[in-house]
Amino acid sequence: MSPIKHKTIRMIKDKIFLFIVGALTLLAILPLFHIIISIVEKGLPIIMERGLTFITGTLSEGGIGPAIVGTLMLTFLATLIGLPLAFLAGAYAYEFPNSFIGRATKMLLQIMLEFPTILVGTFVMGMLVVPMGTFSALAGALALALILTPYVAVYTEEAMAEVPKIYKEGGYALGCTRAQVIFKVITKMAKKGILTGILIGMAKVAGETAPLLFTAGGLYEVYPTNPLEPVGAIPLLIYTLVQSPSIEDHQMAWGAALVMLIIFLAIFVPIRYALKDDIKL
């Protein structure tokens, strides 16, 4: 076979391969675009019809204001509760990978990643809701914190493991303690991976419904102010609305879904952009 013919065959194979990969990639992302388009198409009319009332009003007024505030409150509290534990667990798994506790920590985190979230809700219900005698934002946040923890911890451990060992050795050579090396050297070098894990964890808990059924309670007529009282959330409200036979409630559910999508994009896209190499945090 001549070199020219061999090169031609190779180019044809490359183009076929690229075409197949491109087609499969398009096939994989089509459902995502379909979901986004459906949410915008069905959710935008109800928002345009009711205007600001849909964003700020209570459920009886035709709005989802308390649910929006409840989602933000639950996500913030869950991050506040779960982030320190998750970071420390990830750092410990990185620093002591071969110890019994280190291996047990990694195994437990992997199990928690796949653990049914509804069981987390029932666990927190028995531990906190039943003794308190009421649903509360605190109980919902605790359930969400347990869900957030493994995501942040695993990403933290993996991000730290990718830092070249020369930086760790350099820290020890300068006389730094183990804690100083981990928190001031390794963490700084791995900050993008750690922040990515935090974002993924926050996105996960902000969209959770199952654990909130047993913990948060759902409250949509007043804005939440006390973490010890019941609270609503957008995913929980959507779940409630879609069970109704009313077409108007279904339209509200689509509008709530669009609002939640906008909140996600408004928060996470700028932060993801800030994680690029050319922008310093």
Swiss-Prot record:
Superkingdom: Archaea
Membrane-crossing residue ranges in chain numbering: 16-36, 68-88, 107-127, 128-148, 194-214, 251-271
Membrane protein topology class: Multi-pass membrane protein
PROSITE patterns: ABC_TM1
InterPro entries: MetI-like (IPR000515), MetI-like_sf (IPR035906), Phosphate_PstA (IPR005672), Phosphate_transprt_permease (IPR051408)
GO cellular component, as recorded: plasma membrane
Gene Ontology MF: a single term: phosphate transmembrane transporter activity
Keywords for the protein's UniProt record, in alphabetical order: Cell membrane, Membrane, Phosphate transport, Transmembrane, Transmembrane helix, Transport
UniProt xrefs under CDD domains: TM_PBP2 (cd06261)
One of the GO BP terms on file: phosphate ion transmembrane transport
Gene3D superfamilies found in the cross-reference section: MetI-like (1.10.3720.10)
Main localization category: membrane
UniProt cross-references to PANTHER family, sorted A to Z: PHOSPHATE TRANSPORT SYSTEM PERMEASE PROTEIN PSTA (PTHR42922:SF1)
Family listed: Belongs to the binding-protein-dependent transport system permease family. CysTW subfamily.
Identification of the protein by name: Probable phosphate transport system permease protein PstA
